[in-house]
């Protein structure tokens, strides 16, 4: 199979072809996803909640991310693997580079970091040193204590303008992808249209170039609160491979996420 690259996603954006991505944390699921054509996988710090049982992503370490990235890479040898740099792993550009090198050696193609204009120098340093960067704006889970919970971001003119400014700044600094989480559809559309780089949404409506879901949400195996933007594809199909195929097909056709999964 031909490897999936950042250029592959850029081509999707240019041709207005939606694409689906998903999280994975181990070999078996990574292989299943790759076998079914989900070739863009995030090794997310969401593993702190879904795998380790914490109530936030904050306890996750770089070593945790590297360990799971190694396993996922074995399952998806030709996939485009994104890996989160966890909480306090990129407080300075130098620290970010050192930790990015660790997860890149583990098999990641790109690192994802949460935050806006304050990360410009970090993004520049990483990209100048051949580390591709995916930005993450909107609801950034590592900032849960600042936000006071998991809440929709970017409502109101001032907040939406600030997020658009952040997105443009990250792109100008060299970011090659952007994740937008839990923002109004109208803002997601503004940002997606303003950027040259592909935008991946989660809780941002069906107006972004791609979509991502935490795999546990996509299969209905998350305990406790179920996010508004989540859909249990396994409940409709009864078969995990069929669920993956349905998720991919609904994203590519624009059926998912629907209005019931979106914010305004």
Curated annotation (Swiss-Prot):
Active-site residues, record numbering mapped to chain: 181
Subcellular location: Cytoplasm
Assigned GO CC terms: cytoplasm
Enzyme class: transferase
Domain of life: Bacteria
Gene3D superfamilies referenced in this protein's UniProt entry, alphabetically: Phosphoenolpyruvate-binding domains
Pfam families attached to this UniProt entry: Pantoate_transf
Swiss-Prot/TrEMBL keywords: Cytoplasm, Magnesium, Metal-binding, Pantothenate biosynthesis, Transferase
InterPro entries on file: Pantoate_hydroxy_MeTrfase, Pyrv/PenolPyrv_kinase-like_dom, Pyrv_kinase-like_dom_sf
Pathways per UniProt: Cofactor biosynthesis; (R)-pantothenate biosynthesis; (R)-pantoate from 3-methyl-2-oxobutanoate: step 1/2
EC nos: 2.1.2.11
Substrates-to-products reaction catalysed: 3-methyl-2-oxobutanoate + (6R)-5,10-methylene-5,6,7,8-tetrahydrofolate + H2O = 2-dehydropantoate + (6S)-5,6,7,8-tetrahydrofolate
Residues reported in the UniProt entry to bind 3-methyl-2-oxobutanoate: 45-46, 84, 112
A GO term, aspect molecular function: 3-methyl-2-oxobutanoate hydroxymethyltransferase activity
Cofactor binding comment, as recorded: Binds 1 Mg(2+) ion per subunit.
SUPFAM superfamilies on file: Phosphoenolpyruvate/pyruvate domain
One of the GO BP terms on file: pantothenate biosynthetic process
Binding residues annotated for Mg(2+), in chain numbering: 45, 84, 114
PANTHER family: 3-METHYL-2-OXOBUTANOATE HYDROXYMETHYLTRANSFERASE (PTHR20881:SF0)
Family, as annotated: Belongs to the PanB family.
Complexes and interactors: Homodecamer; pentamer of dimers.
Role description: Catalyzes the reversible reaction in which hydroxymethyl group from 5,10-methylenetetrahydrofolate is transferred onto alpha-ketoisovalerate to form ketopantoate.
Protein name in the entry: 3-methyl-2-oxobutanoate hydroxymethyltransferase
């Amino acid at each position: 199979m031909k490897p999936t690259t950042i250029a592959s996603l850029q081509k999707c954006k240019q041709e207005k072809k939606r694409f689906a991505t998903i999280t994975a944390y181990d070999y078996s699921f990574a292989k299943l996803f790759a076998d079914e054509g989900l070739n863009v996988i995030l090794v997310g710090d969401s593993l702190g909640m879904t795998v380790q049982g914490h109530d936030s992503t904050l306890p996750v370490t770089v070593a945790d991310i590297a360990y799971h990235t190694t396993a996922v890479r074995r399952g998806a040898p030709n996939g485009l693997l994104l890996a989160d740099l966890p909480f306090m792993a990129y407080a300075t550009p130098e620290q970010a580079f050192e930790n990015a090198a660790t997860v890149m050696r583990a098999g990641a193609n790109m690192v994802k970091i949460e935050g806006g204009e304050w990360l410009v120098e970090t993004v520049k340093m990483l990209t100048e040193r051949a580390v591709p960067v995916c930005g993450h704006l909107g609801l950034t889970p590592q900032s849960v204590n600042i936000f006071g919970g998991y809440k929709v971001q970017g409502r109101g003119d001032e907040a939406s303008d600030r997020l658009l400014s952040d997105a443009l700044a990250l792109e100008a600094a060299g970011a090659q992808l952007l994740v937008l989480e839990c923002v109004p559809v109208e803002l997601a559309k503004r940002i997606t249209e303003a950027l040259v780089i592909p935008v991946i949404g989660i809780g941002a409506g069906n107006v972004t170039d791609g979509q991502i879901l935490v795999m546990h949400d996509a299969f209905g195996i998350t305990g406790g609160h179920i996010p508004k933007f989540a859909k249990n594809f396994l409940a409709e199909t009864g078969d995990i491979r069929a669920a993956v195929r349905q998720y991919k097909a609904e994203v590519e056709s624009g059926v998912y996420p629907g209005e019931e999964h979106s914010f305004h």
